[in-house]
A protein has these predicted regions:
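Conserved ABC transporter NBD signature motif
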Residues: 83-91
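Short coil-to-helix segment of the ABC ATPase nucleotide-binding domain corresponding to the Q-loop/switch region
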Residues: 121-128
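Conserved ABC ATPase signature
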Residues: 161-165, 169
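Conserved ABC ATPase "signature" region
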Residues: 25-33, 90-91, 132, 139-156
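ABC ATPase "signature
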Residues: 246-247, 255
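A short, proline-enriched helix->beta-strand linker immediately N-terminal to the Walker B motif
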Residues: 180-184
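Helix-to-loop junction immediately C-terminal to a conserved catalytic motif
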Residues: 75
Length: 304
């Protein structure tokens, strides 16, 4: 197996008074009861995960389980209490603020649940904005932006302003904006959650086609287990800030490590064929992806 593009080792994020001192006093690994009795909130708890080039890792868990906080620790949008995060072999926790800005600008794409579109810019200008920041000339960035606008189904709304769009349309602009930069590492926090079911399915198809062309490394948060089955190479399930199990979708379905994991994987029908887990018929996500990727299309290349 190739070396991990992103590696997180024993990451912690505790909220409370002097969390670093608290961890030190408890040997760097206090149990959950000790954390709570000490008055701390365990947002991320001794979490380790490696993400390999071209892999889609999906993070699942109930609200408050630590999914979004973990992603923000991985991108250093928030500072971890303890642990190590490596990207392309570089220790991100030792990077300067300016170095992190450049890494996020050129190598990371992000779509979070709540993001701010620029209200004074049109849809086309919003999607092209990160390319403008990169210094790409106007004709190329607008061509790329137009392609992404078409991809997310917003043709005809290039000249609209965010206030003129529905919530779902605004989310699609955010997705297009993130896709425009062709990131090496892509963080997505429920990017399709505001879309209606038909558009959501279409966006999943387009997402897989893009992945077949670009081969990006992706960390994806969703509450939808069917979506996770369809998209993931591996799924990590979180509870109380910790990853309780990580593995291939079929492994989690057939051998859940805990009752909590079983809640996400039991009594599910997925795949267009309607295979049922309780019959032992589990469609492999790779087969679904391969079927979609046969129709992969070329994207406009960008250069400075």
């Amino acid at each position: 197996m190739s070396e991990a593009l992103l590696s997180c080792q024993h990451a912690w994020k505790l909220y409370g008074d002097d969390p670093e001192g608290f961890l030190a006093r408890h040997g760097g690994n206090p149990d959950l009861n000790t954390i709570r009795e000490g008055g701390y909130i365990p947002a991320v708890r001794d979490t380790s995960v490696d993400v390999y080039p071209g892999e889609i890792v999906i993070i699942m868990g109930l609200s408050g389980s630590g999914k979004s906080t973990l992603v923000r620790c991985l991108s250093r949008l928030i500072e971890s209490t303890a642990g190590q995060v490596y990207f392309e072999g570089k220790d991100l926790l030792k990077a300067t603020p300016q170095e992190m800005i450049e890494i996020r600008r050129h190598k990371m794409g992000m779509v979070f649940q709540h993001f701010a579109l620029l209200p004074h810019r049109t849809v086309l200008q919003n999607v092209a904005f990160p390319l403008e920041v990169q210094g790409i000339d106007r004709a190329k960035r607008e061509a790329r932006a137009q392609e992404m606008i078409s991809l997310v189904g917003l043709n005809g709304r290039e000249g609209y302003y965010p206030r003129e769009l529905s919530g779902g349309q605004q989310q699609r602009v955010g997705i297009a904006r993130s896709l425009a930069v062709e990131p090496e590492l892509w963080f997505l926090d429920e990017p399709f959650s505001a879309l209606d079911p038909l558009i959501r399915r279409e966006m999943q198809d387009e997402f897989l086609r893009l992945q077949s062309v670009l081969h990006k490394t992706i960390v994806f948060i969703t509450h939808d287990f069917d979506e996770a089955i369809r998209l993931a190479d591996r799924i990590a399930i979180m509870k109380d800030g910790a990853i309780v199990q990580i593995g291939r979708p079929e492994d989690l379905v057939m051998a859940p490590a805990t009752e909590y994991v079983a809640e996400f994987t039991s009594e599910r029908a997925f795949g267009d064929e309607g295979y049922l887990i309780d019959k032992g018929l589990i469609p492999m996500p790779s087969a679904d992806r391969a079927m979609v990727r046969d129709g992969a299309k070329s994207l406009t290349p960008l250069s400075m």
